[in-house]
Amino acid sequence: TTLINMIGGIYYPDSGSIYYENKRVEIRSPKDADRLGIGVVHQHFKLVSSMDAVENIEIALSDKEYKNKADIRKRITDVAKKYGFTVNPDKKICDMSVSEKQTVEIIKAIIKGAKILILDEPTAVLTPQESSSLFNVIRLMKKDGKSIIIITHKLQEVLDISDNVYIMRKGRYIDTLKTSETDENELACKMVGKTVTLQIARTSYEKKKTVLSVHNISCLSDDKTVGLSDVSFDLKSGEIL
């Protein structure tokens, strides 16, 4: 996160250099990063909750390419259609799900002209289905010629989506590996600096006493979408569920 904040212009490095297209560059602000075509989607979104998607993107644009909200709304719709996003341009950020907010951030970066897109822990707060949809979008961006950096600790996601893996530990560079030539065990060992086992002995709780049962729970969210649908589970004594 610290590293991408330097690439994105939020922090300035004490030493070292950044090169963009083989030229040394000074990135002293997010505007500098924007001008270079570097877009960052932070783990904590940089959106104004009381505004809708159109308004958030409008205030992020530094030029006059889009003269009014209708132009921006059309551009949002075009980008969403191209990459398979689902987004309501007129929905307020405060009424959006986490996935929808992330979509707005990505679309904002694309509209601002990002050639390099950096995503900080993009699946940390997404469901597996939302993560799968995001990865489909990322693959389309790759085909479109965009370069993408994903910061994540989820090893299976690293293997599923990346071409190469850059490993850091305690703020230091450790190694760069081709994804096709590594596996979860090697990545885990390099990340923590020692041999680890990913196999865990599981205890059977089939015969344990049931201490909590939930049956067929359903409810609607505040926006009247499905919050829970027919959820059931049992919790056994001594079990971590």
Residue ranges of model-derived segments:
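Glycine-rich phosphate-binding loops of nucleotide-dependent enzymes
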Residues: 1-241
